[in-house]
A protein has these predicted regions:
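Conserved alpha/beta cores of soluble small-molecule-handling proteins
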Residues: 1-97, 101-104, 141-210
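Feature captures the catalytic cores and cofactor-binding loops of soluble hydro-lyases/lyases
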Residues: 134-139
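Glycine- and Gly-Pro-enriched alpha-helical subdomains that act as flexible
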Residues: 98-127, 131-133
Length: 210
């Protein structure tokens, strides 16, 4: 990874790693004999200043049905439902789509979803086949524990979203990003909330980005 970052002369970068089962004649079954897997690593500039400016304003999200397959915990390149949800968000002037299955928010099209209840509890969907866990999510949980912020990993409903004091999303490219609108409605006062701000600051320090 460091070789790719250095080769592209990048200081702050987003690195993407993709592994496939290798090169072989097209067939759904695995090649026999086995072939070496293919590894592709790419890196692109990460503009922390731009990300920080966006976090000061917050972002808008929309909700969309979660029509993905049943094992989204496996990070694959089959992301058509995610791409369609993301495009739907863009057309409505939003940055992200929160996916909903049976009345519960699972995660974003390209991020994890979080709410802050009026009592100050931070809630995110638990790990399992419904969401793609990641390093950012894991790190934010560690930050919350360090700050002694109560955190629960459980499903949460659209009703809870509507009643929440704060909403935010997390991802490698957004870090901790406050949400100020959902489906055209203001979240709280329509500005980034204090808990999302604290978690973002803690995340930046933990990752030595502050």
């Amino acid at each position: 990874l460091s070789t790719v970052v250095k080769g592209n002369r990048l200081k702050n970068a987003l690195v993407y790693v993709q592994v496939t089962r290798g090169v072989a004649p097209r067939n759904h079954s695995f090649p026999a004999p086995a072939v070496p897997p293919s590894l592709v690593v790419t890196a692109k500039p990460f503009d922390l200043q731009k990300c920080e400016a966006q976090a000061e304003k917050g972002v808008a999200v929309v909700t969309r049905p979660d029509i993905r397959w049943g094992r989204v915990d496996i990070k694959t390149i089959g992301l058509l439902p995610n791409a369609l949800a993301k495009e739907a968000a863009r057309r409505e002037g939003a940055s992200e789509a929160w996916l909903v299955r049976e009345g519960k928010v699972t995660e974003g099209a390209a991020s994890n979803a979080w709410i802050v209840t009026r009592s100050g509890e931070v809630v995110t969907h638990p790990l399992g086949t419904d969401i793609l866990g990641g390093v950012t999510r894991q790190t934010v949980i560690a930050c919350a524990e360090e700050l002694q912020i109560k955190i629960s990993e459980r499903p949460f409903s659209l009703k809870e979203v509507a009643e929440a004091a704060e909403l935010f999303l997390t991802s490698a490219s957004n870090l901790v990003m406050p949400i100020v609108k959902i489906d055209g409605r203001d979240v709280g006062r329509g500005e980034p909330g204090p808990i999302a701000r604290r978690l973002r600051e803690a995340y930046l320090k933990r990752c030595a980005l502050a």
